[in-house]
Each structure stands twice: as C-alpha cells, then as structure tokens.
Amino acid sequence: MAQENPKMHNSEMSKRLGAEWKLLSEAEKRPFIDEAKRLRASHMKEYPDYKYRP
C-alpha cells in the first residue's frame, strides 16, 4: 500500500489496513496471529530483561 500510495499519510494507511483486517475471517487472520506469537516468544527469549519505554 505504501509503495502504491507514497504520499498517503500514515494515519490514513492505518485506517485502511485496519478496515481490511476487520474483513478477514479468523482462518485468514490465523497465520498472522501465530507469527506474532512466535516473534513475541522469540523476542522474550532473546531479550528477557526488555521493558517497553516510550
């Protein structure tokens, strides 16, 4: 989406992607959810003392 619309503001892109995500079925979302869990576990293992500090 960013490559197709290089001048689109990030907030607009987030809205559109969020709308597309809501249209996906649970089965379509599952690979992304599973990958996020895998990456979260990997990050926690690699950086056990990490604390998010905005």
From Swiss-Prot:
BP-aspect Gene Ontology terms: developmental process
Name of a matching Pfam family: HMG_box
GO molecular function: DNA binding
DNA-binding region: 1-54
Keyword Nucleus: yes
Keywords: DNA-binding, Nucleus
InterPro entries to which the protein is assigned, alphabetical: HMG_box_dom, HMG_box_dom_sf, SRY-related_HMG-box_TF-like
Cellular component annotations (GO), alphabetically ordered: nucleus
SMART domains: HMG
SUPFAM superfamilies: HMG-box
Record has DNA-binding as a keyword: yes
Subcellular location: Nucleus
Name of the featured protein: SRY-related protein CH2
Lineage: Eukaryota, Metazoa, Chordata, Craniata, Vertebrata
